[in-house]
Amino acid sequence: ASMLPLDKCFKASFCGDDSLIYLPKGLEYPDIQATANLVWNFEAKLFRKKYGYFCGKYIIHHANGCIVYPDPLKLISKLGNKSLVGYEHVEEFRISLLDVAHSLFNGAYFHLLDDAIHELFPNAGGCSFVINCLCKYLSDKRLFRSLYIDVSK
């Protein structure tokens, strides 16, 4: 962030090594990667994207404001959690994921989420069906439990 003119930015978020900075169109920063390498000895990436991505979430701007959707691929990968020990732990995990995924129950802007995912993964298909399935499993305690076998016995 210290390498960019934050006085020109109109929004910025920082968390650990992740940042999202909105700058006016047309500003050029061609040497940011090389400068970061020389100053801090790490690799910095500057992306010019239509859709924001910050801390595993897509920031989708629309005519009435914006909505923040969690990354569906990250949520699906979390379903493979191997540290769960029994069905009580599975239920706690479901409630936690349900809390993270709450905005996915609003499908009004899935078409824009599709566009945002395609911006990062050009060969990805539409996400509506997958998200609806994910929401169905997260909102049904018994259905979610059926994804796991009880290894505590």
From Swiss-Prot:
Enzyme Commission numbers on file: 2.7.7.48
Q: Which UniProt keywords apply?
A: Nucleotidyltransferase, RNA-directed RNA polymerase, Transferase
Primary role: The replicase large subunit is an RNA-dependent RNA polymerase active in viral RNA replication.
Supply the Pfam families for this chain: RdRP_2
Is DNA damage a UniProt keyword of this protein?
no
Q: Name one GO molecular function term.
A: RNA-directed RNA polymerase activity
- Give the catalytic activity: RNA(n) + a ribonucleoside 5'-triphosphate = RNA(n+1) + diphosphate
* Any one biological process term the GO annotation gives: DNA-templated transcription
Asked if Ligase is a keyword of the record, the answer is no
Supply the name of the protein.
Replicase large subunit
Homology family: Belongs to the tobamovirus RNA-directed RNA polymerase family.
